[in-house]
Amino acid sequence: MMNFPLNPAAANEDVRRLYETAFPKEEQIPWKDLMRLMKTMSLDFTVYYEDCDTFTDESTAAGSSRLLGLTIVYPRSQFNWFWYFAVPEELRGQGIGQRILTQLIEKYKGKSNILDMESPEQICENSEQRKRRHAFYLRNGFRDTGVGKSFKGIDYTIMMNGEGTFTQRDYDLIIDELRSFWDSMPKEG
């Protein structure tokens, strides 16, 4: 599996489509805004492709190999926020997500990693999917922090791997930082 940092100018339609189909609309930052936000804050947006013979960058890989997934990580001094993690629906359940997550954890070893996911406890149409996702993260060394949030009617649970704890205050600080970046983002224009 090959992975490449994503340059906003080189983001191809397959990457955009995966982002826009893997997450409910209410959980997405609009694509144009996400590309602008990447110019304001330090986000590690990585795309993953099947191994192939040779290529030099993400745009070349996109033409010669199948897209396996994407991740967006917000590296912070205290911990890393695993913000978005997606594998195409037709490839789920084949161990690809496990390989990507293993690479991510290895890349960011030495610091704890935090993620939020739709709560497996909330009664909803996709409750089985949420339970499978929660079990996936538990199998991969994440644990529930006891911190939760609700946004646009969706309950989220915060999970962590690594040492230490994660508190509501930690979560509130991240949200304040994100708002600050959002407010300072260059406007379209």
Model-derived regions, located:
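Short amphipathic alpha-helix that is part of the acyltransferase structural core
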Residues: 1-33, 60, 169-189
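C-terminal "cap" of GNAT-fold acetyltransferases
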Residues: 46, 130, 150-189
